[in-house]
Each structure stands twice: as C-alpha cells, then as structure tokens.
Amino acid sequence: MATEEDVRRVCLSLPRVTERLSWGQPAWFAKTLMARMWEDGVLTVKTTERDVLAGSEPETYFWTPHHDRSPSLVLVRLDRVADDELRELLEESHRLASRR
C-alpha cells in the first residue's frame, strides 16, 4: 500500500523534479506535470497504458469524465498499489513529462 509520502519520495528522487501545488493539491513536475494528488489517496499520473491498466485492474486504475480529453492520464488508488508498481508508474510518467 502506497501513500502520498511514498509518491513524494519517489518523485523527488527523479532527475529535475520539483514539487509545488496545482489546483490546491501537491504536484510534481519534470518539464511538465508528471503527477498530482487528485484527492486523498488518489494520484494522477501520465501513462501510455491507461486502457490496459483500467481494463485489467479497474479497482486500482480509473479515470473520470474530466480526464476523457487527456488519454495519457490515469488515476491510481494508492491503497491498492504496491511500492514497486508505484515506482514504475512514476518513472514512466517522468519520462513522458520530460519529453516536452
């Protein structure tokens, strides 16, 4: 089970990541936004696998109508994701956010 502190630790261990508020929530930026707390216990990350993740584990990965126009964003329930999986998600999100 991951926590917001785990997210912070992993994000800030990645190259050139900064933390600041976005829409009143903690967020982490590479060149662009790479991760943001959506609400308590739910994290937004960038991925190329949104449909696969949500299709295989909908209790962990999902999106809302707000995210329909952003197919690279997925929401993650932190209490359902293992630490190693969280790290993989954040590393991919970092790569995607660093490309711009």
Briefly describe each language-model feature range.
Residues 1-100:
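Charge-dense, helix-prone N-terminal extensions
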